[in-house]
């Protein structure tokens, strides 16, 4: 059977991703696995496109990510959360805003690796993919976090998140909490 692909996406608005795609093409070729590049900006792709790489302009991440071996991306919260919900390992090459922090958080959760900002090196991306795909603890951790995002003991995840915020603040459930006084 064909191995699951590594999905590579720099986000829908990133037009400065040529080096990410070049590095990903080299890293996945070296690893011997197919890759799927998702971007509307085909001028960012290596030319000619390597045989092991498929390109699509857009894809429904909620359907695509569960079928991926890993997702390599920019670390935006939308892509990060969709990959986390799919239970798939992630490599983040964040450049700005919350992206590097999102990558660091994925590392702490045991489901991702974060590359330094700037142009990615194929060797660093190859090493990050190997670390994720060869570590027997990463895939089960990714699946656990995906389950936790869906439910926690049958309770919807958003309700559980609100309860955790209340617990952390010391307020407890809202029904018994008093609003702050001035």
Outline where the language-model segments fall.
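C-terminal amphipathic helix plus adjacent low-complexity
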Residues: 123-182
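Donor-nucleotide binding loops and adjacent catalytic segments primarily
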Residues: 1-70
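Alpha-helix capping and helix-loop boundary segments enriched in small/acidic/polar residues
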Residues: 93-97, 116, 133, 152
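A donor-sugar binding/catalytic signature common to diverse glycosyltransferases
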Residues: 56-105
């Amino acid at each position: 059977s064909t191995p699951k692909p590594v999905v590579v996406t720099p986000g829908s608005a990133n037009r400065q991703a040529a080096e990410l795609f070049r590095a990903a093409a080299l890293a996945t070729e070296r690893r011997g696995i197919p890759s799927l590049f998702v971007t509307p900006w085909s001028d960012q792709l290596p030319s000619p496109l390597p045989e092991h790489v498929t390109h699509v302009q857009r894809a429904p991440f909620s359907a695509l990510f569960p079928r991926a071996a890993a997702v390599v991306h920019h670390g935006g919260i939308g892509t990060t959360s969709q990959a986390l919900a799919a239970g798939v390992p992630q490599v983040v090459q964040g450049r700005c805003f919350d992206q590097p922090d999102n990558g660091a958080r994925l590392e702490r959760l045991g489901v991702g690796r974060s590359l330094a900002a700037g142009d990615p090196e194929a060797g660093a991306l190859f090493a990050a993919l190997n670390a994720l795909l060869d570590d027997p603890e990463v895939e089960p951790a990714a699946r656990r976090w995906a389950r936790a995002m869906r439910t926690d003991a049958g309770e919807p995840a958003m309700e559980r998140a609100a309860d955790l915020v209340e617990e952390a603040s010391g307020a407890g459930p809202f029904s018994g909490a008093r609003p702050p006084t001035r």
